[in-house]
């Protein structure tokens, strides 16, 4: 069986998984994939409250460093928040499935979130100013109503020896106020939303089921 035709392992962790412990487990899995000892994997989990700084992070974007623990990590991107109610999706996958094109892979991740949210009647989109998935909300004022961009999912990726890892953070029902301690994505006045904040109540299990279905369908269209 071709290395790109092997099945991917789906792992779902219950409870809150410590961020640094998750990094160790992910790094170990990546090394096993490189050595062809284990299959590629998609790991679904949640973290305790934490701020993480990617390789492009500017610490001036950390507005409240005492609010939660702050960890510098090796994923791409800038500052983000992780916490309960947010679905973390760590994708450990061979970049050869995407013609070794990191932009194509990121496009796949964005497409995955957009199609999964659509299953729950949430319309979302890419934004040319920042990687991730965004949606609109109506902002009301005395003079007029207008649509504003709100981020609903973040993407941060790293590649080691042609294996991509880290992945996605999708806001299902986190405490949105916890994002106030940072400038998400380094974009001043960036606004954040969630599935719940969009008026949709779903369980993690329902989201995971839809995500897996869309992942398997999309992978067939993206893989060479």
For each feature predicted by the language model, list its residue ranges:
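Conserved phosphate/anionic-ligand binding catalytic regions in large, soluble enzymes, centered on
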Residues: 161-173
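Short, well-ordered beta-strand elements within core beta-sheets of diverse protein domains
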Residues: 94, 157, 195-197
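Histidine/acidic-rich helix-loop-helix segments that form or flank divalent-metal centers
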Residues: 152-155
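N-terminal lobe of the biotin/lipoate ligase/transferase fold
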Residues: 1-149, 201-205
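C-terminal accessory segment of soluble enzyme catalytic cores
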Residues: 174-224
């Amino acid at each position: 069986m071709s290395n790109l035709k092997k099945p991917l392992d789906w792992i779902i962790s219950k409870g809150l998984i410590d961020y640094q412990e998750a990094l160790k487990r992910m790094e170990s899995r990546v090394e096993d994939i490189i050595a062809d000892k284990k299959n590629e994997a998609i790991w679904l989990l949640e973290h305790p409250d934490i701020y993480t700084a990617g390789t492009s992070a500017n610490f001036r974007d950390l507005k409240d460093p005492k609010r939660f623990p702050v960890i510098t990590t090796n994923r791409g991107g800038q500052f983000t928040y992780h916490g309960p109610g947010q679905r973390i999706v760590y994708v450990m996958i061979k970049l050869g499935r995407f013609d070794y094109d990191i932009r194509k892979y990121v496009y796949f991740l964005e497409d995955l979130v957009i199609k999964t949210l659509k299953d729950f009647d949430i319309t979302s989109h890419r934004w040319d100013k920042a990687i991730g998935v965004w949606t609109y909300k109506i902002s009301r004022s005395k003079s007029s109503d207008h649509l504003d961009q709100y981020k609903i999912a973040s993407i941060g990726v790293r590649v080691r020896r042609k294996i991509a890892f880290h992945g996605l953070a999708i806001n299902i029902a986190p405490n949105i106020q916890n994002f106030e301690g940072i400038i998400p994505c380094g974009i001043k006045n960036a606004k954040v939303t969630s599935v719940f904040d969009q008026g949709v109540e779903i369980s993690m299990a329902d989201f995971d089921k839809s995500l897996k279905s869309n992942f398997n369908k999309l992978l067939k269209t993206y893989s060479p």
